[in-house]
Amino acid sequence: MKSSNGSNNNSSFCLEVWGTDYNKIKNTCILAEKLGYYGFYYGESLADIDLDCWTIISNLSAITNKIKLGPVITYLLPQYRNTFLLAKQAMTLQEVSNGRLEFRTGAGATLQWSSQWWHPYGIDYPNNAQRVSILEEGVQVLDMLWNKQTTAVSFEGKYFKVKGATLQKTTINQKRIPLTIAAKQNKTMQIAAKYADIWESSYITPEQFTSLNKKFDDIHKQFNSDNGVNRSKKISKSIELDVIIADSDSDLEYKKRVFAMERGPSVAHQILKHGLVGKPDEITEKLIEYTNAGVDQFFLAFQDPFDSKALDLFMKAMATR
């Protein structure tokens, strides 16, 4: 795909997948690798909308060769899972996948939106300020466990405590695990500037991304200046978007109606306004707008993640541009 100024663009395209039908998940991952998608990321929650994420992606690593794997988002909540266990799970997957894990996290959605996913399982979903502090401590602990060249790690925080913890490192799992942090707020963008390899925003227009991207770059430069370092010459930029693609007007309108029934009219309207919706040429033009705004990676939630025709149609459109 080329940007409007004619320069080549090497954007990567990733799939966001949820669901409980393992055969569909497996077959879609195999197809995604064949079609040239960069990554395949599976949902994580305790609810019945999906299976266990880390079990699934470990299995997928054994039946694929190149495609990157990881969670759509994995949670650092102390009530949910011991962070040392999570670090060990990640390093193990990095080993068995031959270095293909990409780890994704963030502070999480609002209390009003997300509490319903946690309360049935005895977990009190923290407020925004608490979640931001948990994220900051959690990624610091993970960074120490994965990357610090010491035999033991100790950390004393408000939410996480580690004393003399060690993780076995091998040639493969010593390779840095790429860390994506989803962030829109000042504080979470500061955390991303300090620790992330990939910074991600979600469901915004190219114009909004341009503004937020500039803000993130300023935060990153300020972090480097304040600390006298150049932590990363370039942090990749990612955006999460919904996708509805069809090769005819009638099919497109049908998919939009189904989407509205599934999500509800008001939610669907907001998503459609910010998503990649249209025929291949229309979606390609929208992608060019995002790449011109600074997007390196597209994290794509197709209306039906198991729609093989749509997945193929999308990648064919990218190949012809």
Regions found by a protein language model. Give the residues of each.
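N-terminal beta1-alpha1-beta2 module of alpha/beta enzyme domains
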Residues: M1-P71, K175-I177
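Flexible, glycine-rich active-site loops centered on histidine and acidic residues
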Residues: N8-T20, Q79-A152
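Hydrophobic faces of well-ordered beta-strands that scaffold small-molecule active sites
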Residues: S11-V17, F40-Y42, L69-I73, L101-T105, ...
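Short, acidic/polar
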Residues: T20-A32, L85-Q89, I181-K194, V277-E289
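Acidic (Asp/Glu)-rich catalytic clusters
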Residues: C29-K34, I57-K66, A90-R100, A193-K194, ...
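Conserved, mostly hydrophobic/aromatic
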Residues: G36, L60, L93, L142, ...
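Glycine-rich, proline-tolerant flexible connector loops at the mouths of alpha/beta enzymes
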Residues: G39-I63, Y75-L77, Y203-F209, F299-L313
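Alpha-helix-loop-beta-strand connector modules within alpha/beta enzyme cores
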Residues: L51-T74, I134-V141, Q222, L313-R321
